[in-house]
Amino acid sequence: FSFRNIEEARKVLPENSSYWKSLDGMWKFHWAPNPDERPKDFFRTDYDVSKWDDIKVPVSWNMAGLQRDGKNKYGDPLYSNQRVIFQHSWQPMNDWKGGVMRTPPKDWMTYRNRNEVGSYRRTFNVPADWKGQEIYLNFDGVDSFFYLYINGKYVGFSKNSRNLAQFDITPYLNKKGENV
């Protein structure tokens, strides 16, 4: 990670650098119960997200969707009091005992919400004094697979759930003005 000077570097944490900017805060958000119902072209810069919800990031969308009446706007939070929630032995089974490769019973919450999709959108500006710097975007723990687009262009993807994902976004940025 880059620091502007020795004083910043001695503080060690990235957020102490003037080359660090957090994108935590309010984002536009759309939830879909499955991939077929997701907004397919939302990465386009002209896509209208004005009717999408506002959601504070970072957050679990399932928890953010809890309503006062007890219903959930964004799927159901899934709690497991077991260390491993997926089957990790490959043995033939005649009944459902869990497992990532099996279809759960229809009355289970995991049947209804097997592959939810959250689409996020945020605008930001690059500080003028970052001119000439490489700019990286870090995601510190997305819960699943995701694609990243900047200004309508595909940047990359990550499938490492809850791990750091880092992207060099320098070539995709508008250095003067807003980025989507």
Can you name each region flagged by the protein language model?
Residues F1-G99, V155:
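Accessory carbohydrate-binding/adhesion or oligomerization-edge regions at the termini
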Residues L13-P14, H30-A32, R38, M63-A64, ...:
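Accessory beta-strand-rich segments of carbohydrate-active enzymes
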